[in-house]
Amino acid sequence: MPITEAHAGRRYPPCDPYQVSAAKIVEFAAALGDDNPRYRGESPMAPPTFAAVLSARAWDQLFSDPELELSLERIVHGDQRFTFMRPLHAGDVVIAIVTIDRVRVRAGSELITATVDMASRDGEPICTAQATFAHAREVAT
């Protein structure tokens, strides 16, 4: 059965822990072209958008859920918002959990809003990321 409004509220199990490394922070900042010194050194802080790396790992559970019948090649990422409780730092071990907040079905497509809650291994909240995706159903011929 394809994704419907009834799937709102579905919460997936926690993703495998992700250890934020200084090397990944430096690599990410370089990809952004951001030479902020806070993103380098022995104990760098991650750029705020680094949280998208963790969000994408969590979205995999949503996109690969066979019950939802989502085709990744038919998904457009429409919106992204982050709310930080604190910055990400090298050495953080982060657990991410994705929840389907809302599904709107319209004329052969679905708008899906999902939230990824990120916390330290000890349960300290770090960031919440909310994203909206548009998924187009394949038209029967």
Name the predicted role of every residue range.
Residues 1-79, 140:
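Hot-dog-fold acyl-thioester-processing enzymes
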Residues 1-3, 84-141:
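HotDog/MaoC-like acyl-thioester-processing domains
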